[in-house]
C-alpha cells in the first residue's frame, strides 16, 4: 500500500490541516481507515490522537482509492468540532450502554 498526498490545506479558522490523498493498493483490498491513518501520521508527522480519516472511496475495477483526512492542532479542538458519529467510528469515544 502506497499513499500519495494530492493536496494539503491549512484551515486556520477550525485549527486543522485538510489532507486529500490517494491510496494505491494493487492486488489488495481497500485498506482500513486505521491502516491509512497510521501511514498518514507517520508520513506527515501528525498527532495520532487528533487525526481523523473522513473517507476512503474506492471505484470498481480500480486499484487506486481517494481519501480525505483532517489533522487537528489538538485533541480538544477535534472533540469540539467533529460530530459524535465520526469520533465513535474512529474509536476515540466509546459507545455508552443503556
Swiss-Prot record:
GO biological process, one term: translation
Pfam families in alphabetical order: Ribosomal_S24e
UniProt signal peptide: none
Keyword check for Ribonucleoprotein: yes
Organism domain of life: Archaea
S-adenosyl-L-methionine found in the keyword field: no
SUPFAM superfamilies tied to this protein: Ribosomal proteins S24e, L23 and L15e (SSF54189)
PROSITE patterns hit by this protein: RIBOSOMAL_S24E (PS00529)
MF GO annotations: structural constituent of ribosome
Family indicated by similarity: Belongs to the eukaryotic ribosomal protein eS24 family.
The protein's name: Small ribosomal subunit protein eS24
Species the sequence originates in: Thermococcus sibiricus (strain DSM 12597 / MM 739)
Lineage: Archaea, Methanobacteriati, Methanobacteriota, Thermococci, Thermococcales
